[in-house]
Amino acid sequence: MTLKRMDNVGIVVESLDTAISFFTELGLKLEGRATVEGEWAGRVTGLGTQRVEIAMMVTPDGHSRLEISRFLTPPVVADHRNAPVNALGYLRVMFTV
């Protein structure tokens, strides 16, 4: 099996509207917006029952997507912002502008 393309990157934010506005200014287009909730969604993430507002944005070339999430339940864990650069997990997403 070989990689064909990068499909999407997920980011959790405090304000979905602010994030959509920011990435729209950079040239991404809003592809869709929805609320995802229920036990089935919790099974995917391992968080149990959850309620999340999501927005899917697509890059101008149409090759990649940015999935922006705002968790309503369970509450977000905010202390990751003080994590050092070598902490496991998401660190950055880079775009050519």
Question: Over which residues does each language-model region extend?
Answer:
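A short, acidic/glycine-rich surface segment
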Residues: G38-R43, P75-R81
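Basic/polar N-terminal segments that are highly enriched at the extreme N-terminus
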Residues: M1-T2
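Short hydrophobic/aromatic-rich motifs at helix boundaries and adjacent loops
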Residues: L26-L28, P74-V77
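Histidine- and/or cysteine-centered catalytic micro-motif in compact active-site loops
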Residues: T35-V36, F71-T73
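Vicinal oxygen chelate
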Residues: R5-E14, E53-L72, D79-V97
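Core segments of cupin and vicinal oxygen chelate
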Residues: V12-H63
